[in-house]
């Protein structure tokens, strides 16, 4: 995430555009749950904005990511912000309760609750990366606020660096 990357530039003298420095991110609370059977998430195994709690629900087994029944839940920014300061126990209980209707007859046999501070950039930079000479910033704040955007940004920044190296 950009806010964590800025610390690398503090002693370099590299000046970054103000708009880039002001990039902010929504927080996301997440739950990864291992189940004792199949979930109730419909094919093809993913749901966006399923309800007033979750912005993403993914059945990892249905998507071919896991050999065992496992499901990932990402709470939306509003719900995540509201519950960010809840204790780990309370946060886990609330998100698990909200997830129940997507489990079907399955029970959670193991779970992990996550707080993702820099989850989704609120504003996307207009270019696929930012370069200050040989220092390149890339990621989801440049080419789109999902993993696909981060990958595309990384590819474009790698091409840029390749051109720099190839020209020397």
Show which residues each predicted segment covers.
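Central helical "cap/lid" subdomain
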Residues: 1-44, 105
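Active-site substrate-recognition segment that forms the wall
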Residues: 26, 32-84, 90-103
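Short FAD-binding loop at a beta-strand-to-alpha-helix junction that anchors the flavin cofactor
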Residues: 71, 126-158
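Short Gly/Pro-enriched loop/turn and capping motifs at secondary-structure junctions
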Residues: 78-80, 116-121, 143-144
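Short, amphipathic alpha-helical "lid/cap" segments that border enzyme active or binding sites
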Residues: 92, 96, 151-162
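Flavin (FAD/FMN) cofactor-binding core of flavoprotein oxidoreductases
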Residues: 93-133
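Active-site-proximal substrate-binding core of FAD-dependent oxidoreductases
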Residues: 106-108, 162-168
């Amino acid at each position: 995430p950009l806010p964590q990357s800025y610390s690398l530039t503090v002693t370099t003298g590299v000046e970054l555009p103000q708009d880039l420095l002001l990039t902010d991110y929504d927080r996301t609370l997440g739950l990864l749950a291992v189940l004792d059977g199949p979930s109730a998430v419909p094919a093809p195994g993913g749901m966006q904005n399923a309800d007033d709690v979750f912005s993403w629900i993914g059945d990892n087994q249905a998507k071919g990511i896991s050999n065992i029944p496992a499901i990932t839940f990402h709470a939306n920014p509003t719900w995540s912000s509201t519950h960010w300061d809840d204790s780990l126990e309370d946060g886990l209980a609330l998100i698990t309760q909200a997830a129940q209707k997507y489990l079907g007859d399955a029970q959670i046999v193991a779970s992990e609750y996550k707080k993702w501070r820099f989850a989704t950039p609120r504003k996307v930079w207009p270019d696929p990366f930012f370069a200050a000479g040989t220092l390149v910033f890339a990621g989801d704040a440049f080419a789109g606020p999902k993993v696909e955007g981060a990958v595309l940004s990384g590819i474009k920044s790698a091409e840029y660096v390749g051109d720099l190296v190839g020209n020397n």
